[in-house]
Amino acid sequence: MTNPLNSTAANRSNQPSSDGISDGQITNEEAESLINKKNCSGHKLKEVTDSDTFSDNGKDDSDTKKRFHYHQDQRRMSLTSIVAVESPSSSNAPSRKTIDLGHGSDLIYIQRFLPFQQSWTFFDYLDKHIPWTRPTIRVFGRSCLQPRDTCYVASSGLTALVYSGYRPTSYSWDDFPPLKEILDAIYKVLPGSRFNSLLLNRYKGASDYVAWHADDEKIYGPTPEIASVSFGCERDFVLKKKKDEESSQGKTGDSGPAKKRLKRSSREDQQSLTLKHGSLLVMRGYTQRDWIHSVPKRAKAEGTRINLTFRLVL
């Protein structure tokens, strides 16, 4: 039987992309920025190695170990030295950033958690094989269509997940083996952590979003650890500190559009991260008790983003 991960990787690597950019070498920072921009526009990258080396002047460039390039008609442009972390378990472990939110709450962000091309392989698999649904939910007593696709995977025997009047169908981990590979990679960078459920979300464009909320359901306990892996188009992830009365009463705050509500918060009471393709964000401690978070609408986010949030149901 053909491995769906291998086949999707082959399809992606063989697809040309039109970029409208002239030939020439650019810096690593410019290359990464360009990659993120093109990913959000639905463009795909092809990975090349030493045997495919070339440059503007037509001379062999044997010093380049690994590059990504775009095709536009017969022109080629190389993005030099874009080398992803080989493996979360390698001796050259991916660098991480810790953000202390205060009062026992913190975040961990690993931008290059998974290798670049492998992340696209996972993206293709998830986009095509997950049974996505866009359910009707209830917000402030009104029924509306959830502004993103979703799916739920969990171990057997767990308390059912219910949010906004919606109870998703629970699929088995065995239904989607690549999810176990991603979970194993998380365990390698978060030793001692444990997760038994997964909520998947797919944002298909600029109008898809998630409003202000906290993942403070009782089934997760008072200090849940939530590991969030992102694939595809990068999107902003915004946190806002709850009001004192909201935090003490366990309320999740208002559910209004994140972009509008954000303007009412002070800079000290908010955090914003741009979650990259293949990145890992971990929320820990009392983050769900004291903070709410959102993924706002973004006019320039034309591509699809898939996000996996691993959780532990007690």
UniProtKB/Swiss-Prot annotation:
Entry superkingdom: Eukaryota
Lineage, broadest ranks: Eukaryota, Viridiplantae, Streptophyta, Embryophyta, Tracheophyta
GO molecular function annotation: broad specificity oxidative DNA demethylase activity; DNA demethylase activity; metal ion binding
The protein's name: DNA oxidative demethylase ALKBH2
Catalyzed chemical reaction(s): a methylated nucleobase within DNA + 2-oxoglutarate + O2 = a nucleobase within DNA + formaldehyde + succinate + CO2
Pfam families membership: 2OG-FeII_Oxy_2 (PF13532), DUF4057 (PF13266)
Positions bound to Fe cation: H213, D215, H293
Residues reported to bind substrate: W132, A160, L161, V162, Y163, D216
Alphabetical keyword list: Dioxygenase, DNA damage, DNA repair, Iron, Metal-binding, Nucleus, Oxidoreductase
Species, as recorded: Arabidopsis thaliana (Mouse-ear cress)
Class of the enzyme per the UniProt entry, highest EC level: oxidoreductase
A single cellular component GO annotation: nucleus
Necessary cofactors: Fe(2+)
Compartments in which it is found: Nucleus
PROSITE patterns, per the entry: FE2OG_OXY
